[in-house]
Amino acid sequence: MVKSVVSTVHFDVMDLPFSRRGSWLAISWIKASHPTRHVPEGLYLRTVRDRGDYQQLFRIDLPADGGREIRAEASPSIMHLFPGGTKNERSGVVDVCIPTTSSVRFRGRGTLLRLSSIPGSELSYAIPRGEGSWIVNMLGAGLRLMLTPLRGKLHVDAPWQAQGSQPMRFEMHPDIAGEFDIVIEEFAQALTPNRLHPPFEDEAAAIEADFLAFAARHGGEGPFSETADIARYILWSCIVNPEGAITRPTVLATKDRLTGIWSWDHCFTALALCPGDPALAWNQIMTIFDHQDEFGALPDAVFDRRVVQNFTKPPVHGWAIGRMLKLGCLDRAMKEEAYLHLARWTDFWFSYRDYDGDGVPQYDHGNDSGWDNASPFILRPPLEAPDLATFLILQMDTLAVLADELERSKEAIAWREKSTAFLRLATSHLTRRGRMDFVVSGTHEEIPNESLLPYLQLLLGNRLTESTRTSLLKSLEEEGYITQWGIATESTLSRHYSSDGYWLGPIWAPSTFLMVDALFRSGENNLAKEIGSRFLDLVETSGFAENFDAITGAPLRERAFAWTASTYLILARDISARP
């Protein structure tokens, strides 16, 4: 009996890659306007390893109707492809699933399937394996694939040219009943062809069950459940198995272009995962800390093949782990690990990022702040920064809490004293015009700016003076930061504001979440809920983009970002729980 797989979650492959938990494979629509992509627009089978243009393994075409546009519809378990750009099964359909983390399966009726390689190294090749299977070695991607037809006929056009096969084209033709079925498996050195696969529907049903189990652990509240389902799909599908420098099961930033883990993105994802799956959330934190160096520094980002160590990211980790502690996500072993790593991370900033020796650490570059091109960094760094001081104060507070819970009472006292002393030093040292602001390390010249970054000091809540809080809140509401969609990263009145300027204006998930938390901590509950609700509305309208036009709400850059999905889920949960 044929099983029917029904999903309540559906999405557009034009916006979201089709993948599954654990897999390094995905199917994505690559747009002609996509930055840094140098391949023709179309639908591609990809690896999400760090391979640049070589991520694209095969372009997918359905040659029926003269090879016109493909229409794609997807759920977490199955993607349906229709030739001719219209949903009409009489013209043929190809169903796709990802039955294991290392394979993709295509089943078709009434159409052909064409897979075409992207021009690359002359050493890439295709050779017959026997039993109808072919082995494809893609040098640029660093992958070997086996194509095994389960039903129908595989036609191969891959002429040998001295040391390889370029170009390579594979076509699946239906059998006499008008159907075909083929599985593509990735492997390293050895794999035996297997023609005995479970029925397609059984494999799709198992995928759907895996997603539903994940979704059940990360349930949404309130009226946001439909979009929350997509958010949970993004998190589930962005998980990869450990490989290379990625040492644990980890949620990538996206399975679109930026397929790595950055050393502050991961905190927001961990917070979203924490209530439903503390172990996965902790892996999300530790994937970065596994690469903490001998000085205590964290890398900028981690990919499967490389660790980016020439930049870093801000110490938001104490703030994030402090929230995880309040959620009850960490067992004693996790707390021990957190304490040791956070202590070294904190010491790094005071020991190695304070070149003028004044006790106030600095950023060497905008990338180190996470806000790469924010307006304070238009002038030459190093810059001493209010957000950096704030994060270090909060990190020492979290270290004190951890020390208490680990029965390290003397260390807890020491961390609280250090936090209090640094708060006093930072506020006296950085305060200009009634608030902490950016200054040049060494000269302490003020850096005039209209960035949202200085407002993150509101995370200190009532530890700031009342006059400082009042001044910050007044300018936040009156000076062009708050729009109908949320909170801009640069005042919309600023001469540096740019609608698609990355950190020079667009709305981002992490800045929104940090500001919502800051406003709650400052007692501005109504404003916090209003900004959080506007962000939820923004995502409902424009999807899970990397960032958004602060004026129009239009989605910008990547379209399936995990920290946008994470922030959506956290805010939906937190705002609905607030009176």
Model segments located where?
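The feature captures the catalytic groove of carbohydrate-active enzymes
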Residues: 171-196, 295, 300-316, 323, ...
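Aromatic- and histidine-enriched alpha-helix N-cap/loop-to-helix transition segments
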Residues: 257-268, 276, 308-319, 337-341, ...
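Terminal accessory carbohydrate-recognition/targeting modules of carbohydrate-active enzymes
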Residues: 1-223, 256, 521, 562, ...
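Alpha-helical support elements that line or immediately flank enzyme active sites
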Residues: 260-291, 453-465, 512-525, 532
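Short, ordered beta-strand-loop transition motifs
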Residues: 1, 96-102, 164, 174, ...
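Specific register positions within alpha-helical solenoid repeats of the TPR/Sel1-like families, i.e.
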Residues: 271-275, 319-326, 397, 404, ...
